[in-house]
């Protein structure tokens, strides 16, 4: 066990985690040059296209160190984006140390900070590494000082490397062996293994990625899942080199996979503990705290025949993505679907894209909302995640909106723009500290404003240099209203939205104007209205298409023309009373883009 090292790589988006992990795999000979491709561990198409890591992946490598010993390095690549922080905390729970990778040109960013503090709270050894020293903009000395100032760990001797060119990679490996402590565990005791991740394989059932804390697990053991009490015989055990390599046994301190032919999708929940039936551990390992969804949106299949497939797809996806929450919902406009909870907007986009790609579904999404706390006049307190579930306005005593604490790191020259943006988003400044050229700001901003487009606008006002990390702190009373959209005097529940009263009128006006361009014209006028309760705050009309019924009258008597026009008018009136309007998917998405063009 003294030769095992378990570690993760934590870093901000685009600081070179995946490239560094490629280089480590290559150096230790995990894959031959022919099999090597860039971003080996980003196995999903979406990860490659967007250039981001979404899922944590694990690899076991053998490293022949300079002291003549061979070390087993188990490392877990983690995502850097703020929406996938939950994946990071799970990966860190399985490790004794973490490599903190910082771009020597960009310096410390907010997400680096957040993940680094998570690692420190778990008492992990944090090893700083300055990456991308081959870039002309790199300034490793300044960045090393930044790490000391902002994070407070000693970075004077930090390894300087370039994952792209391979410079300094052997130093990184030596540093891992030297600084990160070996795991401690009892080899002979009862088995305790933590499930870091699970996914569903059509042939093998549930595949679980586990970290064995105590004891050992081998093929043929009767494995018991502690939360459900289910017992299954172990079929395969091994680790990833990144390819699956069967070893038949995993001992304390090791990270690998276990397949026990579990066909039930919820058979091995993430964060659970595995033990062996008959020689059981006394208690389960402390799991992870569940990530609470911050954003909710309705997902509906375009054709109602896909509902069953959609339900199965969500079940399979949720085993792999433990932070996804869903429950059935039905809408008068869109039929049956699910209300899903996500960690943020990027998470929502990724989930929708994975469902459409991997399961071949066609989906409509409604506008995302956050959870509001509503106190009714009867004194009940409700948590509401959908505008459709809001009680009538006169039954509401008080609405409280969730407030997020946002930590923003921004270079001094963009400070003014960022402060202006935070004020527009109804933010309250609580702290501001200067660290060299960087400024650390802390704001309390309503979660509803943060999840809509705050991240995008923060990036554009600061030319991409500002970085953001946020978490929920409290509910606070606010003057919120529900804006309903009426099409031909009928409410469309899927388009309702909750917003602050001060912005509601301009919001309603923008929305109906935008929808006017998206709804196809009919043979009769379509009235689009935005309303708060029974008060109409904005209106716009989709003009009718008119057929020229007088085309075949040459000259002739005026009464003949009047008769034809009257007949047309009656026909339109009848049509309007029975005609219904199809709303295209773009109209539902229009809600997301209000205010972006300003």
Curated annotation (Swiss-Prot):
Residue positions binding GTP: 14-19, 131-134
GO molecular function terms noted in the UniProt entry: GTP binding; GTPase activity; guanosine tetraphosphate binding; ribosome binding; translation elongation factor activity
Compartmental location: Cell inner membrane
Gene3D superfamilies xref list: 3.30.70.240, Elongation factor 4, C-terminal domain (3.30.70.2570), Elongation Factor G (Translational Gtpase), domain 3 (3.30.70.870), P-loop containing nucleotide triphosphate hydrolases (3.40.50.300), Translation factors (2.40.30.10)
Entry EC number(s): 3.6.5.n1
GO BP terms in the entry: positive regulation of translation
Membrane topology: Peripheral membrane protein
Record has Metal-binding as a keyword: no
Catalytic activity: GTP + H2O = GDP + phosphate + H(+)
HAMAP family referenced in this protein's UniProt entry, alphabetically: LepA (MF_00071)
Protein name: Elongation factor 4
Organism of provenance: Psychromonas ingrahamii (strain DSM 17664 / CCUG 51855 / 37)
């Amino acid at each position: 066990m003294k030769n095992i090292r378990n570690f993760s790589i934590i870093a901000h988006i685009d600081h070179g985690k995946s490239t560094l992990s490629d280089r480590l795999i290559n150096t230790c000979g995990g894959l031959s040059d022919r099999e090597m491709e860039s971003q080996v561990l980003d196995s999903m198409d979406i990860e490659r296209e967007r250039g981001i890591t979404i899922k944590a992946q694990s690899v076991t490598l053998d490293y022949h160190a300079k002291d003549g010993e061979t070390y087993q390095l188990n490392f877990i690549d983690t995502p850097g984006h703020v929406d996938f922080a939950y994946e990071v905390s799970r990966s860190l729970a399985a490790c004794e140390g973490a490599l903190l990778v910082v771009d020597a040109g960009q310096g410390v960013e907010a997400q680096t900070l957040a993940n680094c503090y998570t690692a420190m709270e778990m008492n992990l050894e944090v090893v700083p590494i300055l990456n991308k020293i081959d870039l002309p903009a790199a300034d490793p000395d300044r960045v090393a000082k930044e790490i000391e100032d902002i994070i407070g760990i000693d970075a004077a001797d930090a390894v300087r490397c370039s994952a792209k060119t391979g410079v300094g990679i052997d130093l990184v490996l030596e540093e891992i062996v030297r600084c990160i402590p070996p795991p401690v565990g009892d080899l002979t005791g009862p088995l305790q293994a933590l499930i870091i991740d699970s996914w569903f394989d059509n042939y093998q059932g549930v595949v679980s990625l586990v970290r064995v804390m105590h004891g050992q697990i081998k093929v043929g053991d009767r494995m018991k899942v502690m939360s459900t009490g289910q017992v299954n015989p172990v079929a395969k055990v091994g680790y990833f080199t990144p390819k699956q390599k069967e070893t038949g046994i995993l001992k304390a301190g090791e990270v690998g996979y276990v397949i026990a032919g579990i066909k039930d999708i919820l058979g091995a929940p993430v964060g659970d503990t595995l033990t062996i039936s008959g020689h059981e551990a006394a208690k389960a390992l402390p799991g992870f705290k569940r990530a609470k969804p911050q954003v909710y949106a309705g997902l509906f299949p375009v054709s109602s025949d896909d509902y069953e497939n959609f339900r199965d797809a969500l079940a399979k996806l949720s085993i792999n993505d433990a932070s996804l929450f869903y429950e059935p919902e039905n809408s008068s406009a869109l039929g049956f679907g699910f209300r899903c909870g996500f960690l943020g907007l990027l998470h929502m986009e990724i989930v929708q894209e994975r469902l459409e790609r991997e399961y071949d579904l066609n989906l409509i999404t409604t506008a995302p909302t956050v959870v509001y706390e509503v106190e009714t006049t009867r004194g009940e307190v409700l948590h509401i995640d959908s505008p459709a579930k809001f009680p009538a306005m006169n039954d509401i005593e008080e609405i409280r909106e969730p407030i997020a604490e946002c930590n923003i790191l921004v270079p001094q020259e963009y400070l003014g723009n960022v402060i202006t943006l935070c004020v527009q988003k109804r933010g309250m400044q609580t702290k501001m500290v200067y660290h060299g050229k960087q400024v650390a700001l802390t704001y309390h901003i309503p979660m509803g404003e943060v999840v809509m487009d705050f991240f995008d606008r923060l990036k554009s006002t600061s030319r991409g240099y500002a970085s953001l990390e946020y978490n929920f702190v409290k509910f606070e009373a606010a003057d919120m209203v529900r804006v309903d959209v009426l099409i031909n005097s009928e409410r469309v529940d899927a388009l309702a939205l909750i917003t602050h009263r001060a912005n509601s009128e301009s919001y309603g006006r923008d929305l109906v104007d935008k929808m006017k361009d998206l709804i196809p014209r009919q043979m009769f006028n379509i009235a689009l209205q935005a309303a708060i309760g029974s008060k109409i705050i904005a209106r716009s009309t989709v003009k009718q298409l008119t057929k020229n019924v007088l085309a075949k009258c040459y000259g002739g008597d005026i009464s003949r023309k009047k008769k034809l026009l009257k007949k047309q008018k009656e026909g339109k009136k009848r049509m309007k009373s029975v005609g219904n309007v199809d709303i295209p998917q773009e109209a539902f998405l229009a809600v997301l883009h209000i205010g972006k063009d300003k």
